[in-house]
C-alpha cells in the first residue's frame, strides 16, 4: 500500500459511535479513555510495519542455472557471423534466466510492544471523542438473522451510507456474532485479544459489546 493511502487511513475523520441496548438506544456507555501519551506519528509507523509484515514475499524468478535445458552450445564459437553464445539459458536470450530477479524473502519488521500499544491507544482515543458505544450483550444470537442485523444497524447509525465500514469489537467468547457479519462486505469483526490498527482506522463506525468495552478501558486507560 502506498504512502498516500496509509496517510489517508491515519487521517480518517473521527466518526461517531452508536449506542444500543437490546438493539435500541435507550441506554449507553461511552469510550472515554484517560491517556497521557498520544502519537500520530506512531500510527503511521506501526500501520506501515503491519502492512509490510503481511507481505508474503514469495516472488521468485529463475537464474540461468535454474532454467531447464540450455546445456548445448547453440552454435560454434567462430565462423557463423553470429555473436558468440554459450547457452540458451543466458539472460540475453528469450526464455533464459533472469539477472538479479526477486527471490523469496521475508519483509517482516519488528514493532516494539510499547509502540504498538501506544498506536492502538492513540487510534482508540481519536475514535472515542464524543462518541457512544453499542451494547449487544442482551442480543439473542440464536434467532438473529444477518438481514435483520443489517437493517437495524443502518437504521441506528445516523446518516449511514452503504459504502461506510462498520467494525464490531467483541470479547472472544462472543464467537456467535461472527456468523452474522461474515457475509456482509462492509462489516467486520475483531476481538479484544487481537485489536487491528488498520481495521480501527478504516472503520467509519465501531460497535463495542459491553464486555469488550470494559476490557478495552481496563487496558488502555492505564497508558
From Swiss-Prot:
Sorted UniProt keywords: Chloroplast, Plastid, Ribonucleoprotein, Ribosomal protein, RNA-binding, rRNA-binding
Organism the protein comes from: Guillardia theta (Cryptophyte)
Family: Belongs to the universal ribosomal protein uL4 family.
Disulfide-linked positions: none
Gene Ontology BP, a term: translation
Name the record gives this protein: Large ribosomal subunit protein uL4c
Subunit structure and binding partners: Part of the 50S ribosomal subunit.
Annotated function: Probably binds the 23S rRNA.
Database matches in Pfam families: Ribosomal_L4 (PF00573)
Family matches, as InterPro entries: Ribosomal_uL4, Ribosomal_uL4-like, Ribosomal_uL4_dom_sf
Gene Ontology CC terms, in alphabetical order: chloroplast; ribonucleoprotein complex; ribosome
Tree of life domain: Eukaryota
Cellular compartments annotated: Plastid, Chloroplast
Record GO terms (molecular function): rRNA binding; structural constituent of ribosome
Region span, Disordered: 61-96
